[in-house]
Design a protein with these regions (language model features):
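Nuclease catalytic cores that cleave nucleic-acid phosphodiester bonds
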Residues: 57-167
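Domain-level signal for Mg2+-assisted phosphodiester chemistry and nucleotide/NA-binding surfaces
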Residues: 1-92, 132
Length: 167
């Protein structure tokens, strides 16, 4: 991996659900968001980070949201929708896309922490706007589309002990 220019202004967008379910399904573990944020920034000028999270009716995730805030990550919260028949949904794809486009004006590098292939067109758009786009995700669950679209893909599975809280 190449050394990152320290003058680059960096924004980090974290698709919490994508990383959470990948870590749980692959390792039965929780994500170390502090380590991921440090990896993303890599000594460059940190401008902002957003974590896109889902709130349930019980509110049990509030301490987790507070922990993210203490790391300097702004939480974007969406309530979990429950539909007739028991289906549940809390899709952040459009929200992440809108934020990426809206907030990247004074940014050199957008770091997307998600393996969701639906973001490949967003990655292409940002690159066409002159932004460098780096993707951080779990290689086995990340879409080949997003891996190919990114200027750089970092596979969290290279160092699971660093990026996960293993049991």
């Amino acid at each position: 991996m190449l050394k990152k220019p320290k003058e680059q202004r960096v924004e980090v967008l974290i698709d919490v659900q994508n990383l959470y379910y990948s870590a749980r399904n692959l390792y039965g573990a929780k994500v170390n968001f502090d380590a991921i944020l440090k990896k993303a920034i890599s000594g460059r000028k940190f401008v902002r980070a957003f974590a896109y999270v889902v709130r349930t009716k019980t509110g049990e995730e509030k301490p987790f949201f507070e922990a993210l805030t203490k790391l300097g990550i702004e939480t974007r919260i969406r309530d979990l929708q429950e539909f007739y028949g028991g289906a549940k949904k809390a899709d952040w794809d459009v929200g992440i896309t809108v934020d990426a486009i809206r907030t990247s004006t004074n940014i050199d590098v957008v770091i997307l922490c998600s393996g969701d292939g639906d973001f490949a067109p967003l990655v292409e758009y940002l690159k066409n706007q002159g932004k460098r786009v780096e993707v951080i995700a779990f290689g086995r669950t990340a879409s080949s589309k997003i891996k190919e679209a990114a200027d750089e893909f970092f596979d969290l599975e290279q160092s699971p002990r660093k990026f996960l809280f293993l049991k």
